[in-house]
């Protein structure tokens, strides 16, 4: 399958996705999401059968997600939306978290769900959790999603907050003030 990876950076997760998909025999190309024009150019040149976005901060242009299957790998549980998912999970001291593969649509992180899996959270830095649990889970979901797209018979699950397994919510970008630790003490 011709798979285009669109990423905000060629980070560890994107590199691992590249290597894993290549090892599975897929024809893989990568483009950085530098601008909507650069994304459109990469899509036109490569003509992918599937677009995977392992690490994306920007929106996919509508003229692309309307014509291609574009899957966003989101570091959050089903229903979780927003740019600071893992930050909020760590701050809220949740017991488990997850990764969701969802279809790109106009509303960020609100598309149909192609795959989702959870993992237990541990007491560690965001970077460590991202490099280990998030990356491992994301790679599994990307493999599952590629198989589902290739089958031509899989129907993704619409995001439905009425479902018991949809526990996430829309959260804002975490600001520095949200991360601060109270230093005031009483004498």
Please describe what each predicted stretch is.
Residues 13-14, 39-40, 59-62:
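Short, well-ordered alpha-helical microsegments
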Residues 1-19:
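N-terminal beta1-alpha1 ligand-phosphate binding loop
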Residues 25-38:
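A short beta-strand-loop structural module common to alpha/beta enzyme folds
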Residues 16-28:
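A short, Lys/Arg-enriched amphipathic alpha-helix followed by its capping loop at the start of a domain
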Residues 56-180:
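Donor/substrate-binding cores of folate-linked one-carbon enzymes
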Residues 18-19, 36-48:
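N-terminal beta-loop-helix "entrance" segment that forms/cooperates
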Residues 6-10, 33-34, 54-55, 185:
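Structural motif
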Residues 43-60:
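Short, structured active-site "lid" loops
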